[in-house]
Amino acid sequence: MIPFICVERYIYDDTTPRILFDYHAAFQSATSYFFESGHENVLFLVEKTDSLAKQEKIAGYEKALLCANRTLSSSCIAEISLYQSYDLISLNIQKSISRYLPTAIITGGNRLTMLLLKALRELGKDCPRDISIIGFDDMLWCELTAPPLSCIHRDIRQMAELASQALFDRINHLPASPLARYADIHLVLRDSTRIIDNGPLGEQAVSPDSISLSTEEKALLKKGHYQVAVSFHYTGTAWAALHQKGIRDELEQYGIDIISTMDAHFDPALQNMQLESIKMQHPDAVIAIPSDDVETGPAFQELSRMTRLVFLSNVPQNFNRNDYVSCISVNERENGTNTGRMIGEYLKDKAHAKVGFIIHGAMFYGTTERDNYAEKILRESYPNIEITARKGFIQIENAYKVCLEMVTEHPDIQALYISWDRPALLAIKALKTLNRTDIAVFTTDLDFEIAQEMNQGFVKGLSTQRPYDQGKAVALAVAKSLVSDNVPKYIGVQPYVVHEKQLKRAWKDIFFEALPEELGG
């Protein structure tokens, strides 16, 4: 009898050797990733066939449902026939999206992935803002799309090698290998997926696009001669300046005046005094970033009884939903996940890598979420990486000493996570003092000085907020609150990932100007 083996298929109840991919585990992993990222409706698009591979993919999807304590009746599976025109296939995908209203979609084939992109374009849907995607088969073009696609990656080369080995074993009558052998298949995460954030009080985040003003509301705003006060924790950064510009540009459209802008210099006591001054100005609304969630809470509570409060980044402790209008923030879960994933990808080829975490450590909701999710993605997705040290700096000026002590105590650290750019600059200064510029730095927020360090190779990657967009979003929420009670409680803005070689483009996207000459522009 001529020796033969089955590749990616097998004869049911037969003893013929087969080389397979574990589709059940792969699609369970992809579906679970979306559930863990806050998605409720995850649509699975699969080709309409009778193959065992399709059944395994569906079984993996359904297992993820059960593991997430969901019933099979909540499944969103659409079987799509590929034996029709591309336009008809796209139309059927669009119908499935309209039926299930997913925030995330997984495809079971590479042609389905391409046709899904076509369908989303025709629907005017943005990926990942409106719908996140995990495609199938990590083709070369998957990194070239906008955004680059997350995919279930199959190691075809390994499958061919296993198949060749199994076939030669049979030809040479060697001892039988296992009946089924599996080639590697795993999830590759890029920029086509997003994490759905929750607000400080558990509210699901909505996009700034969910707020709109009618013609009548705009007219009411211009007639109202409204006044707004701004209380910032600190204004001495480009981040704060861009927030202020976004706020000013948006409010000016509706004739709303900014009567004061306060800078607390990260001092809760000073901010409390400034809030007393704001009270005497009797503004129609206040935009604020608390410098400390606990210490400023009572002062903000008192202010909430006389005016509308719209917060940036975080809400003071002991506030309930009736105490403020809305909170606008970068999606901090995604911000941290992006940074953690960059560390993971940087070190993924190391057999065993060690990382240090220099976290904020203060009572600040946004940075706590960010730091925790950076750690979470490393622990769950990169088993070769060990977090050997984790310490909070509390006050920015402490970051230098914390880094100095951490690297001295753990000299085998290969990369550092630092909560945001200003403490990261002090940590880099400590690394230079120790002559340890071999340690890669990853952080959040883009500014001139951190861009300089990225240009010089110290910072390998960062995830940044979109401060101008966030400023416009908070101003729009304020404007809406002056003429309507229909304002979302939590508005999340998607962060922006910056790799070393993408600094020029990122600078233009974030700051709306060309990269300065000093940075290579």
Model region roles, listed by residue range:
Residues L43-V46, A53-L140, S164-Q165, L187, ...:
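Hydrophobic alpha-helical
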Residues A30-N69, L179-S192, V228, F232, ...:
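An alpha-beta-alpha
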Residues I196-H225, D509-G521:
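Intrinsically disordered, low-complexity acidic/proline-/asparagine-rich linker or regulatory tail/stalk regions
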Residues Q94-L201, L434-Q502:
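Flexible loop/turn connectors
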